[in-house]
Amino acid sequence: DPVAPTVLIFPPAADQVATGTVTIVCVANKYFPDVTVTWEVDGTTQTTGIENSKTPQNSADCTYNLSSTLTLTSTQYNSHKEYTCKVTQGTTSVVQSFNRGDC
């Protein structure tokens, strides 16, 4: 049976923004079958600066874990507000997002 992922998004730390390069991390845990990760910035789908890393299938429950990072310059990051990670599995999507400056 399909297992929906638990999705978490992690905004960059303020001291990372100061370095000039920002990474935003999206994690999808314990899912089956496979998923697709889409990044959106202010509603626009991103196609560059994305790196996905998937763990091998868990032998106990046959699920996967995936980590996806979106890398931007601090200038790019500061010029946008809403950052969204969308994890799609078949016809179902789990969406997590944050607004820059909320915390």
From Swiss-Prot:
The keyword Phosphoprotein does not apply. Gene3D superfamilies: Immunoglobulins. Residues 5-95 form the Ig-like domain. It comes from the Eukaryota. Pfam families: C1-set. Disulfide bonds join C26-C85. PANTHER family: TAPASIN. This is Ig kappa-b4 chain C region.
